[in-house]
Protein backbone atom coordinates (compact mmCIF):
# COMPACT_ATOMS: atom_id res chain seq x y z
CA UNK A 1 0.00 0.00 0.00
CA UNK A 2 0.99 3.65 -0.38
CA UNK A 3 2.34 5.35 2.76
CA UNK A 4 4.19 8.47 3.85
CA UNK A 5 7.22 7.38 5.81
CA UNK A 6 10.42 8.43 7.49
CA UNK A 7 12.92 6.28 5.60
CA UNK A 8 16.14 8.02 6.60
CA UNK A 9 17.42 9.87 9.63
CA UNK A 10 17.06 13.38 8.29
CA UNK A 11 14.53 16.05 7.28
CA UNK A 12 11.50 15.26 5.13
CA UNK A 13 9.22 12.29 4.46
CA UNK A 14 8.94 9.95 1.49
CA UNK A 15 5.87 8.58 -0.29
CA UNK A 16 6.63 4.89 -0.60
CA UNK A 17 5.11 1.40 -0.68
CA UNK A 18 4.79 -0.65 2.49
CA UNK A 19 3.11 -3.89 3.47
CA UNK A 20 -0.59 -3.65 4.35
CA UNK A 21 -0.92 -4.08 8.14
CA UNK A 22 -1.99 -7.38 9.63
CA UNK A 23 -5.19 -7.44 11.66
CA UNK A 24 -5.07 -8.99 15.12
CA UNK A 25 -7.99 -10.72 16.84
CA UNK A 26 -9.00 -7.49 18.60
CA UNK A 27 -8.12 -5.06 15.81
CA UNK A 28 -9.96 -3.22 13.07
CA UNK A 29 -8.47 -2.38 9.68
CA UNK A 30 -9.37 1.12 8.53
CA UNK A 31 -9.25 2.27 4.92
CA UNK A 32 -8.08 5.85 5.29
CA UNK A 33 -10.15 8.64 3.71
CA UNK A 34 -8.52 11.77 5.11
CA UNK A 35 -5.58 12.61 7.33
CA UNK A 36 -4.50 15.92 8.85
CA UNK A 37 -0.99 17.19 9.46
CA UNK A 38 -0.17 17.76 13.12
CA UNK A 39 2.52 19.87 14.75
CA UNK A 40 4.06 16.57 15.83
CA UNK A 41 4.38 15.63 12.15
CA UNK A 42 6.23 18.90 11.58
CA UNK A 43 8.73 17.92 14.28
CA UNK A 44 9.15 14.58 12.51
CA UNK A 45 9.53 16.30 9.13
CA UNK A 46 12.19 18.67 10.50
CA UNK A 47 13.90 15.78 12.32
CA UNK A 48 14.51 17.85 15.43
CA UNK A 49 16.03 16.59 18.67
CA UNK A 50 12.73 15.19 19.92
CA UNK A 51 12.10 13.31 16.67
CA UNK A 52 15.63 11.92 16.59
CA UNK A 53 15.17 10.49 20.08
CA UNK A 54 11.63 9.20 19.54
CA UNK A 55 10.78 8.09 15.99
CA UNK A 56 11.79 4.62 14.75
CA UNK A 57 13.30 4.53 11.25
CA UNK A 58 11.98 3.32 8.87
CA UNK A 59 8.31 3.86 9.77
CA UNK A 60 5.27 5.56 8.26
CA UNK A 61 3.83 8.25 10.49
CA UNK A 62 0.65 10.32 11.01
CA UNK A 63 -2.06 10.07 13.66
CA UNK A 64 -4.95 12.37 12.66
CA UNK A 65 -7.38 10.51 10.42
CA UNK A 66 -10.81 9.27 9.43
CA UNK A 67 -11.74 6.24 7.36
CA UNK A 68 -13.98 3.20 7.16
CA UNK A 69 -13.64 -0.25 8.66
CA UNK A 70 -12.90 -2.85 5.98
CA UNK A 71 -11.78 -5.80 8.13
CA UNK A 72 -12.22 -6.87 11.75
CA UNK A 73 -10.52 -9.36 14.03
CA UNK A 74 -12.58 -12.32 15.19
CA UNK A 75 -12.94 -10.99 18.75
CA UNK A 76 -14.21 -7.52 17.75
CA UNK A 77 -17.73 -6.59 18.84
CA UNK A 78 -19.71 -3.38 18.44
CA UNK A 79 -18.44 -2.46 14.99
CA UNK A 80 -19.39 -3.45 11.45
CA UNK A 81 -17.72 -3.42 8.06
CA UNK A 82 -18.34 0.01 6.54
CA UNK A 83 -18.49 1.92 9.84
CA UNK A 84 -16.88 5.34 9.48
CA UNK A 85 -14.40 5.89 12.31
CA UNK A 86 -11.64 8.05 13.63
CA UNK A 87 -9.58 6.77 16.52
CA UNK A 88 -7.75 7.54 19.72
CA UNK A 89 -4.06 7.79 18.84
CA UNK A 90 -2.85 6.81 22.31
CA UNK A 91 -2.84 3.04 22.67
CA UNK A 92 -2.87 2.12 26.34
CA UNK A 93 -1.87 -1.05 28.17
CA UNK A 94 -5.16 -1.73 29.98
CA UNK A 95 -3.36 -3.21 33.00
CA UNK A 96 -1.66 -0.39 34.91
CA UNK A 97 -3.34 1.23 37.90
CA UNK A 98 -4.68 4.19 35.91
CA UNK A 99 -6.05 2.03 33.10
CA UNK A 100 -7.78 -0.28 35.55
CA UNK A 101 -9.27 2.75 37.32
CA UNK A 102 -10.70 4.13 34.07
CA UNK A 103 -8.05 6.84 33.66
CA UNK A 104 -6.57 5.53 30.45
CA UNK A 105 -5.36 8.97 29.33
CA UNK A 106 -2.86 8.70 32.21
CA UNK A 107 -1.49 5.28 31.21
CA UNK A 108 2.24 5.21 31.91
CA UNK A 109 2.73 2.69 29.07
CA UNK A 110 1.05 4.69 26.29
CA UNK A 111 2.15 3.95 22.72
CA UNK A 112 1.47 6.62 20.10
CA UNK A 113 0.11 5.83 16.64
CA UNK A 114 2.48 7.34 14.08
CA UNK A 115 5.04 8.06 16.79
CA UNK A 116 5.98 4.76 18.44
CA UNK A 117 4.21 2.47 15.96
CA UNK A 118 3.07 2.60 12.32
CA UNK A 119 0.77 5.50 11.59
CA UNK A 120 -2.17 6.76 9.57
CA UNK A 121 -0.39 8.44 6.64
CA UNK A 122 -1.21 5.40 4.54
CA UNK A 123 -4.02 3.74 2.65
CA UNK A 124 -4.76 1.44 5.61
CA UNK A 125 -4.32 1.53 9.38
CA UNK A 126 -4.80 -1.29 11.90
CA UNK A 127 -5.59 -0.31 15.50
CA UNK A 128 -7.20 -2.01 18.50
CA UNK A 129 -10.98 -1.85 18.17
CA UNK A 130 -11.04 -0.27 21.64
CA UNK A 131 -9.39 2.82 20.12
CA UNK A 132 -11.83 3.22 17.21
CA UNK A 133 -14.60 5.81 17.51
CA UNK A 134 -17.69 5.85 15.29
CA UNK A 135 -18.39 9.14 13.52
CA UNK A 136 -22.03 10.28 13.19
CA UNK A 137 -23.17 10.82 9.57
CA UNK A 138 -23.68 14.57 9.98
CA UNK A 139 -19.97 15.14 10.73
CA UNK A 140 -17.83 15.52 7.60
CA UNK A 141 -14.69 13.54 6.84
CA UNK A 142 -12.66 16.75 7.04
CA UNK A 143 -13.87 17.52 10.57
CA UNK A 144 -13.59 13.91 11.68
CA UNK A 145 -9.96 13.83 10.53
CA UNK A 146 -9.05 16.54 13.07
CA UNK A 147 -10.71 14.92 16.10
CA UNK A 148 -7.26 14.28 17.61
CA UNK A 149 -6.26 17.98 17.92
CA UNK A 150 -9.89 18.99 18.48
CA UNK A 151 -9.75 16.56 21.39
CA UNK A 152 -6.62 18.22 22.76
CA UNK A 153 -8.43 21.56 22.62
CA UNK A 154 -11.55 20.08 24.23
CA UNK A 155 -9.66 18.34 27.03
CA UNK A 156 -7.74 21.53 27.80
CA UNK A 157 -10.63 24.00 27.54
CA UNK A 158 -13.14 21.89 29.46
CA UNK A 159 -10.77 21.10 32.33
CA UNK A 160 -12.50 23.87 34.27
CA UNK A 161 -15.96 25.44 34.36
CA UNK A 162 -15.95 28.25 31.78
CA UNK A 163 -19.52 29.58 32.07
CA UNK A 164 -19.36 33.32 32.68
CA UNK A 165 -15.58 33.25 33.10
CA UNK A 166 -12.86 35.39 31.51
CA UNK A 167 -10.47 33.11 29.64
CA UNK A 168 -6.92 33.81 28.44
CA UNK A 169 -5.43 31.55 25.76
CA UNK A 170 -1.72 31.93 24.96
CA UNK A 171 -0.84 30.49 21.55
CA UNK A 172 -3.02 30.75 18.43
CA UNK A 173 -1.98 27.53 16.76
CA UNK A 174 -4.86 25.36 15.52
CA UNK A 175 -5.44 23.84 18.96
CA UNK A 176 -5.47 27.24 20.67
CA UNK A 177 -7.86 28.63 18.06
CA UNK A 178 -10.21 25.66 18.49
CA UNK A 179 -10.02 26.12 22.26
CA UNK A 180 -11.18 29.72 21.79
CA UNK A 181 -14.18 28.52 19.79
CA UNK A 182 -14.99 25.90 22.43
CA UNK A 183 -14.76 28.41 25.27
CA UNK A 184 -17.21 30.78 23.60
CA UNK A 185 -19.52 27.92 22.65
CA UNK A 186 -19.86 26.70 26.24
CA UNK A 187 -20.50 30.14 27.73
CA UNK A 188 -17.27 31.95 28.60
CA UNK A 189 -17.68 35.71 28.96
CA UNK A 190 -14.48 37.11 27.42
CA UNK A 191 -12.08 34.90 25.46
CA UNK A 192 -8.75 36.61 24.77
CA UNK A 193 -6.10 34.83 22.70
CA UNK A 194 -2.50 36.02 22.24
CA UNK A 195 0.19 35.29 19.67
CA UNK A 196 2.53 37.10 17.26
CA UNK A 197 1.16 35.46 14.09
CA UNK A 198 -1.42 37.75 12.46
CA UNK A 199 -2.74 35.02 10.14
CA UNK A 200 -3.66 32.73 12.99
CA UNK A 201 -4.98 35.56 15.14
CA UNK A 202 -7.38 36.38 12.30
CA UNK A 203 -8.47 32.72 12.31
CA UNK A 204 -9.17 33.07 16.03
CA UNK A 205 -11.38 36.10 15.35
CA UNK A 206 -13.32 34.10 12.77
CA UNK A 207 -13.75 31.33 15.34
CA UNK A 208 -15.29 33.66 17.94
CA UNK A 209 -12.49 35.01 20.13
CA UNK A 210 -13.52 38.22 21.90
CA UNK A 211 -10.08 39.71 21.27
CA UNK A 212 -7.12 38.31 19.33
CA UNK A 213 -4.02 40.14 20.50
CA UNK A 214 -0.66 40.43 18.75
CA UNK A 215 1.50 40.93 21.82
CA UNK A 216 4.35 42.31 19.73
CA UNK A 217 2.20 45.39 19.10
CA UNK A 218 -0.51 45.48 21.75
CA UNK A 219 -0.46 45.28 25.54
CA UNK A 220 -2.52 42.57 27.20
CA UNK A 221 -3.13 44.97 30.11
CA UNK A 222 -4.62 47.52 27.69
CA UNK A 223 -6.92 44.86 26.26
CA UNK A 224 -8.06 43.89 29.76
CA UNK A 225 -8.85 47.54 30.48
CA UNK A 226 -10.83 47.82 27.23
CA UNK A 227 -12.89 44.81 28.33
CA UNK A 228 -13.43 46.35 31.79
CA UNK A 229 -11.57 43.49 33.44
CA UNK A 230 -10.33 44.75 36.79
CA UNK A 231 -9.43 41.53 38.61
CA UNK A 232 -7.66 39.34 36.03
CA UNK A 233 -8.51 36.18 34.11
CA UNK A 234 -10.34 33.33 35.79
CA UNK A 235 -9.04 30.58 33.49
CA UNK A 236 -5.80 30.32 31.51
CA UNK A 237 -5.13 27.86 28.67
CA UNK A 238 -1.43 27.79 27.80
CA UNK A 239 -1.01 26.35 24.29
CA UNK A 240 2.28 27.84 23.07
CA UNK A 241 5.09 26.36 25.14
CA UNK A 242 6.70 29.83 25.05
CA UNK A 243 8.09 30.84 28.47
CA UNK A 244 7.30 34.54 28.03
CA UNK A 245 3.68 33.67 27.22
CA UNK A 246 3.35 31.62 30.40
CA UNK A 247 4.93 34.45 32.40
CA UNK A 248 2.40 36.95 31.03
CA UNK A 249 -0.41 34.52 31.82
CA UNK A 250 0.66 34.16 35.45
CA UNK A 251 0.79 37.94 35.79
CA UNK A 252 -2.69 38.35 34.28
CA UNK A 253 -4.48 35.70 36.34
CA UNK A 254 -6.96 36.54 39.08
CA UNK A 255 -6.40 35.15 42.57
CA UNK A 256 -7.73 31.60 42.67
CA UNK A 257 -7.43 31.29 38.90
CA UNK A 258 -7.03 27.97 37.14
CA UNK A 259 -4.50 27.18 34.39
CA UNK A 260 -4.37 24.20 32.02
CA UNK A 261 -1.02 23.60 30.32
CA UNK A 262 -0.91 21.87 26.93
CA UNK A 263 2.08 23.68 25.41
CA UNK A 264 5.48 22.16 26.22
CA UNK A 265 8.00 24.76 27.44
CA UNK A 266 11.75 24.17 27.32
CA UNK A 267 13.20 22.09 30.14
CA UNK A 268 14.21 24.08 33.22
CA UNK A 269 11.92 27.00 32.32
CA UNK A 270 11.93 29.46 35.23
CA UNK A 271 8.74 31.13 36.46
CA UNK A 272 7.87 33.49 39.30
CA UNK A 273 6.50 31.07 41.86
CA UNK A 274 5.25 33.98 43.95
CA UNK A 275 2.57 34.45 41.28
CA UNK A 276 1.46 30.84 41.73
CA UNK A 277 1.63 30.60 45.51
CA UNK A 278 0.32 33.97 46.67
CA UNK A 279 -2.45 34.01 44.06
CA UNK A 280 -3.44 30.47 44.99
CA UNK A 281 -3.37 29.35 41.36
CA UNK A 282 -4.31 25.83 40.28
CA UNK A 283 -2.16 24.42 37.46
CA UNK A 284 -3.04 21.26 35.55
CA UNK A 285 -0.96 19.48 32.91
CA UNK A 286 -2.82 18.16 29.85
CA UNK A 287 -1.79 15.22 27.69
CA UNK A 288 -4.00 13.85 24.95
CA UNK A 289 -7.70 13.26 25.44
CA UNK A 290 -9.77 11.61 28.16
CA UNK A 291 -10.90 8.22 26.86
CA UNK A 292 -13.56 8.56 25.77
CA UNK A 293 -15.35 11.34 27.57
CA UNK A 294 -13.52 13.94 25.47
CA UNK A 295 -14.70 12.23 22.28
CA UNK A 296 -18.36 12.28 23.31
CA UNK A 297 -18.07 15.96 24.22
CA UNK A 298 -16.55 16.75 20.81
CA UNK A 299 -19.48 15.14 19.00
CA UNK A 300 -22.02 16.83 21.28
CA UNK A 301 -20.53 20.28 20.68
CA UNK A 302 -20.52 19.84 16.90
CA UNK A 303 -24.10 18.58 17.01
CA UNK A 304 -25.12 21.60 19.09
CA UNK A 305 -23.72 24.15 16.66
CA UNK A 306 -19.98 24.53 17.27
CA UNK A 307 -18.52 25.55 13.89
CA UNK A 308 -14.90 24.51 13.39
CA UNK A 309 -14.92 24.73 9.60
CA UNK A 310 -12.76 27.91 9.40
CA UNK A 311 -9.83 26.08 11.02
CA UNK A 312 -9.45 23.84 7.94
CA UNK A 313 -7.63 26.10 5.48
CA UNK A 314 -5.86 23.80 3.02
CA UNK A 315 -6.68 20.52 1.28
CA UNK A 316 -4.36 18.43 -0.90
CA UNK A 317 -4.26 14.98 -2.43
CA UNK A 318 -1.98 12.68 -0.45
CA UNK A 319 0.41 12.58 -3.42
CA UNK A 320 0.84 16.35 -2.99
CA UNK A 321 1.93 15.97 0.63
CA UNK A 322 4.93 18.26 0.10
CA UNK A 323 2.56 21.16 -0.62
CA UNK A 324 0.67 20.34 2.55
CA UNK A 325 3.80 20.37 4.69
CA UNK A 326 4.93 23.59 3.01
CA UNK A 327 1.64 25.20 4.00
CA UNK A 328 2.10 24.11 7.61
CA UNK A 329 5.72 25.23 7.69
CA UNK A 330 4.78 28.66 6.33
CA UNK A 331 2.88 29.55 9.50
CA UNK A 332 -0.01 30.75 7.36
CA UNK A 333 -2.39 27.83 7.69
CA UNK A 334 -4.86 26.30 10.04
CA UNK A 335 -5.35 22.57 9.70
CA UNK A 336 -4.09 20.98 6.47
CA UNK A 337 -5.94 17.93 5.13
CA UNK A 338 -4.51 15.16 2.92
CA UNK A 339 -7.02 13.17 0.85
CA UNK A 340 -6.13 9.48 0.42
CA UNK A 341 -9.10 8.68 -1.83
CA UNK A 342 -7.87 10.48 -4.97
UniProtKB/Swiss-Prot annotation:
Binds 2 Zn(2+) ions per subunit. PROSITE patterns: ADH_ZINC (PS00059). It comes from the Bacteria. The active site is at residues 40, 43. Its EC number is 1.1.1.103. Zn(2+) 2 binds at residues 93, 96, 99, 107. It catalyses: L-threonine + NAD(+) = (2S)-2-amino-3-oxobutanoate + NADH + H(+). Belongs to the zinc-containing alcohol dehydrogenase family. Homotetramer. This is L-threonine 3-dehydrogenase. The gene is tdh.
Amino acid sequence: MKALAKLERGPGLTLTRVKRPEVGHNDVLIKIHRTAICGTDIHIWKWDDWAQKTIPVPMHVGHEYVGEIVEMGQEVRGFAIGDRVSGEGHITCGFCRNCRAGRRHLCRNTVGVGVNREGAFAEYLAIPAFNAFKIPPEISDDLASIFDPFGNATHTALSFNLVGEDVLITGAGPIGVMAAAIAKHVGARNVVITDINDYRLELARKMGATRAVNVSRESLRDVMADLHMTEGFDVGLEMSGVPSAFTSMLEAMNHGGKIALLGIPPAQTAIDWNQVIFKGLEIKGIYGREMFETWYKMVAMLQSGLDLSPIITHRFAADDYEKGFAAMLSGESGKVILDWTV
